[in-house]
Amino acid sequence: MADSNCGCGSSCKCGDSCSCEKNYNKECDNCSCGSNCSCGSNCNC
């Protein structure tokens, strides 16, 4: 139940990691369910 986007256009699911392009900004931040994920950050709920 997480339809939030991981800044790179990929959809981020609970527990899944957001894959991003190498060119994208790499700001690793933890994101909660429903919040936006930064590039390369893990979504933990």
UniProtKB/Swiss-Prot annotation:
Keyword Mitochondrion annotated: no
Purpose of the protein: Metallothioneins have a high content of cysteine residues that bind various heavy metals. Functions as a metal chelator of copper (Cu) and zinc (Zn). Plays a role in Cu homeostasis in the roots under elevated Cu concentration. Functions cooperatively with the phytochelatin synthase PCS1 to protect plants from Cu and cadmium (Cd) toxicity. Plays a role in Cu homeostasis, specifically in the remobilization of Cu from senescing leaves. The mobilization of Cu from internal sources is important for seed development. Confers tolerance to Cd and plays a role in Cd and Zn homeostasis.
Expressing tissues: Expressed in phloem and mesophyll cells of leaves, vascular tissues of cotyledons, sepals and petals. Expressed in anthers. Expressed in root endodermis and at lower levels in cortex of mature region of roots.
Molecular function terms from GO: copper ion binding; metal ion binding
Parts forming coiled coils: none
Endoplasmic reticulum listed as a keyword: no
Organism superkingdom: Eukaryota
Gene Ontology BP annotations: response to copper ion; response to high light intensity
Family membership: Belongs to the metallothionein superfamily. Type 15 family.
Organism: Arabidopsis thaliana (Mouse-ear cress)
Record key words, sorted: Metal-binding, Metal-thiolate cluster, Stress response
Descriptive protein name: Metallothionein-like protein 1A
Inducers of expression: By light stress, drought and salt stress.
